[in-house]
Amino acid sequence: MAEAVESPGDPGTTTPRPLFAGLSDISISQDIPVEGEITIPVRSRVREFDSSTLNESVQNTIMRDLKAVGKKFMHVLYPRKSNTLLRDWDLWGPLILCVTLALMLQRGSVDSEKDGGPQFAEVFVIVWFGAVTITLNSKLLGGNISFFQSLCVLGYCILPLTMAMLVCRLVLLAEPGPVNFMVRLFVVIIMFAWSIVASTAFLADSQPPNRKALAVYPVFLFYFVISWMILTFTPQ
């Protein structure tokens, strides 16, 4: 860019003058060094080192994950409105519970491979397909919970039913009869209600107020099917 100035000889004409022409008269006799240091606080570096798990041993990592799973189990056993399962979600607990429940539902017959395989696969299909269906239903109803958070909650809340299956296996060691069935029925009903209460305590606030019933109804069916499998289980 240039700036126009009037020529002293001809008032009607102008001659262009550079915009920064005055800066050429400025000179620096010598270079002025810029000195200084950029320091990083020691505490921040220590925090970053402590929070990093790259240098953590495998044993410490496994123990840390197991402690986190155990804390979530306690939240399910003592259900209350909390965002712990939603904030720190994982799928290790649901996987452990699903495998444990499938192994206990596996029949004891060794004569036919069909007695064990379908039962084990059936539990996996019901648990994961049911959890995915409930999650999609929750999202369609306008819930503000993510996909994996819903899977985490639904999977962890199988814990009471897994405990019911363990009790039923122990009761089935005794002589079968009406008393045996009534004991198993009572245990399954209590644990079924426990799973419903625990899951709704975590998922209720994530649904719109006028659609909570529509979101809870599939959860009821989900745990009812698992409870029915536990109640009708008979070892061979």
From Swiss-Prot:
Task: Note the Pfam families from the entry.
Answer: Yip1 (PF04893)
| Transmembrane segment boundaries | 85-105, 116-136, 147-167, 185-205, 213-233
One GO BP on record is:
endoplasmic reticulum to Golgi vesicle-mediated transport
Membrane topology per record: Multi-pass membrane protein
Q: Which UniProt keywords apply?
A: Acetylation, Golgi apparatus, Membrane, Phosphoprotein, Transmembrane, Transmembrane helix
InterPro entries according to UniProt:
Yip1/4-like, Yip1_dom
Q: Please classify the protein's predominant subcellular localization into one broad category.
A: Golgi
Q: Which residues lie on this side of the membrane: Cytoplasmic?
A: 2-84, 137-146, 206-212
**An example Gene Ontology cellular component term from the record?**
Golgi membrane
Location(s), subcellular: Golgi apparatus membrane
Residues annotated as carrying Phosphoserine in the record are 7
Where N-acetylalanine occurs, the residues are: 2
Lumenal compartment: which residues? Answer: 106-115, 168-184, 234-236
Family statement drawn from the similarity comment of this UniProt entry: Belongs to the YIP1 family.
Q: What does this protein do?
A: May be required for stable YIPF1 and YIPF2 protein expression.
| Oligomeric form and interacting partners | Predominantly interacts with YIPF1 or YIPF2, but may also form a ternary complex with YIPF1 and YIPF2. This interaction may stabilize YIPF1 and YIPF2.
Identify this protein by name.
Protein YIPF6
